[in-house]
Design a protein with these regions (language model features):
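Active-site gating/metal-coordination segments in enzymes
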Residues: 45, 56-157, 224
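Short, acidic/polar
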Residues: 27-38, 88-103, 204
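A short, flexible beta-alpha/helix-coil linker loop
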Residues: 13, 18-20, 52-54, 85-86, ...
Length: 269
């Protein structure tokens, strides 16, 4: 008998809203749709991640709606709250602990997915991380490009800014996600391949592997095509990676719409 999985990364809505123009004009899953998908995939429940960023198009899912999903469908959802570092007059002095503790008292287990299109070490982002660390709230981040046409925290090839924040906030758990994170699993990554799904054998010296070995506060979110590709592109490496870092890898789907396919779930089964 297979053990049912917990999904660290899902986006749902209570009811249909504005079609998302960044997602082929479909919308998020409703609780009933997600439950049917989970039952087919052998997933017990998932962590709802609010979508609050201006970089994400169409239907925004706030903290209150996400909490309501958990309150009305506790068999399907846990949740993270989400905070944009620019909230609070776009200042690097905003007291985010007030909000974090408020949502933590409502059962939020962390913060994410952080998609603000700012540098990892922007003072406003560093301020948010400091409050997350103080409130013991792990964060899930998406890595993007800057300044146009993308979403997510910004870093250069080989993730020097991510290393800076890992070093600065040793008690804060970071969960890495997205193409620009998972492409760094291979040591031969180039700038041209950062935003895609590289194929072929994984070369030694990958930055993600190096950072995992160096910083115990870095964990990984295996969701979406990027996480699946990192594990499946080189099966021998993938098995070894899963074995070495098994206590710091979180299964996820990143289900955003009812038609999404989840190859990693079946592969791991």
């Amino acid at each position: 008998m297979l053990v049912k999985k917990i999904d660290i990364h899902v986006h749902s809505c209570l009811k249909r809203g504005t079609p998302r123009f960044d997602l082929d004009f479909s919308d998020y899953t409703t609780p009933g749709e997600l439950r049917r998908m989970y039952d087919e995939l052998g997933i017990e429940k998932g962590v709802q991640l609010p979508e609050i960023g201006v970089e994400c198009g169409g239907h925004f899912i706030g903290n209150e709606e996400s909490y309501e999903l958990v309150r009305t469908h506790p068999e399907t959802y846990d949740w993270f709250c989400n905070i944009d570092p620019r909230w609070g007059l776009n200042s690097d002095q905003t007291n985010f602990s007030y909000l974090l503790n408020y949502y933590k008292n409502l059962g939020a287990k962390g913060v994410g997915e952080i998609c603000a299109n700012l540098y990892f070490d922007d003072p406003r982002v560093m301020n948010l991380f400091a409050h997350c660390e103080a409130c013991d709230m792990p964060v899930i981040f998406h890595i993007g490009s800057f300044p146009y046409g993308d979403y997510g925290l910004v870093d250069e090839l080989h993730l020097p800014r991510l290393e800076k924040v890992l070093k600065t906030f040793p008690k804060l758990m970071f969960l890495g996600h997205s193409q620009k994170f998972w492409a760094e699993i291979s040591g031969d990554l180039t700038e041209e391949d950062r935003d895609g799904y590289p194929t072929g054998p994984v070369a030694p010296g990958g930055r993600v592997v190096e950072l995992l070995r160096k910083y115990p506060n870095l964990c990984c979110d295996l969701s979406a095509g990027s996480g699946e590709n990192a594990i499946r592109r080189d099966p021998e490496f993938g098995y070894a990676f899963l074995e070495e870092f098994q206590d710091r890898l979180y299964f996820g789907t990143d289900i955003c719409a009812p038609h999404n396919e989840m190859g990693l779930s079946k592969y791991l089964d």
